[in-house]
Every structure is written in C-alpha cells, then in structure tokens.
Amino acid sequence: MSGSTGERSFADIITSIRYWVIHSITIPSLFIAGWLFVSTGLAYDVFGSPRPNEYFTESRQGIPLITGRFDPLEQLDEFSRSF
C-alpha cells in the first residue's frame, strides 16, 4: 500500500454532517433553478430554439424540407424568408 495523500476517504465525506448540510441545500436549489429556467421559457431564448407554438406559423404549415439537389440555397432562402 502506498503512502497517504492526506485526503479524506469517500466514506468519511458522505457520512459527515457537513456534507449533508451543504448538499441538502445545493441539490434542491439546482433542481429548482433548472425547473425555473425551462418553465419560464428562458431556455428557449438563451439557446434560440423555437417555442412549441412557433414551429408552424399560419403562413408556413409544411415541413421545411430541402428536396432539390442542385438548388438547395434557393430553397434555404425561401424558408428563411418565411420566418
């Protein structure tokens, strides 16, 4: 067995009261922060993804599918104009 590095063992850490005091606050806080991030719609704004009611508009009900092999840029321009 090699020498000690001076670090506490994992069993010592998870059985300490200090560990559970810290983590009983931080783990629920992270869960609540994530839930608020998604439920308020901020996640849609930060990552730029459309909200569920914005995928299909009144003017564009079809799927934006590239079908032309030789003119994909024209189709992309047409799709981007409809946004």
From Swiss-Prot:
Primary localization: plastid
Knockout-associated phenotype: Plants unable to grow photoautotrophically, no detectable PSII activity although under low light (10 umol photons/m(2)/s) on a carbon source plants are green.
Residues given in the record as heme binding sites: H23
Needed co-factor(s): heme b
Bilayer-spanning residue ranges: 21-35
UniProt cofactor note: With its partner (PsbF) binds heme. PSII binds additional chlorophylls, carotenoids and specific lipids.
Residues annotated as signal peptide: none
Statement: the UniProt record of this protein carries the keyword Metal-binding: yes
Gene Ontology cellular component terms for the protein in this record: chloroplast thylakoid membrane; photosystem II reaction center
Keyword annotations from UniProtKB, A to Z: Chloroplast, Electron transport, Heme, Iron, Membrane, Metal-binding, Photosynthesis, Photosystem II, Plastid, Thylakoid, Transmembrane, Transmembrane helix, Transport
Any GO molecular function: electron transfer activity
A Pfam family the protein falls into: Cytochrom_B559
Membrane topology, from the record: Single-pass membrane protein
Any single GO BP term: photosynthetic electron transport chain
Subcellular location: Plastid, Chloroplast thylakoid membrane
Record-linked HAMAP family: PSII_PsbE (MF_00642)
Subunit structure: Heterodimer of an alpha subunit and a beta subunit. PSII is composed of 1 copy each of membrane proteins PsbA, PsbB, PsbC, PsbD, PsbE, PsbF, PsbH, PsbI, PsbJ, PsbK, PsbL, PsbM, PsbT, PsbX, PsbY, PsbZ, Psb30/Ycf12, at least 3 peripheral proteins of the oxygen-evolving complex and a large number of cofactors. It forms dimeric complexes.
Function: This b-type cytochrome is tightly associated with the reaction center of photosystem II (PSII), and is essential for PSII function. PSII is a light-driven water:plastoquinone oxidoreductase that uses light energy to abstract electrons from H(2)O, generating O(2) and a proton gradient subsequently used for ATP formation. It consists of a core antenna complex that captures photons, and an electron transfer chain that converts photonic excitation into a charge separation.
Family statement: Belongs to the PsbE/PsbF family.
Listed name of the protein: Cytochrome b559 subunit alpha
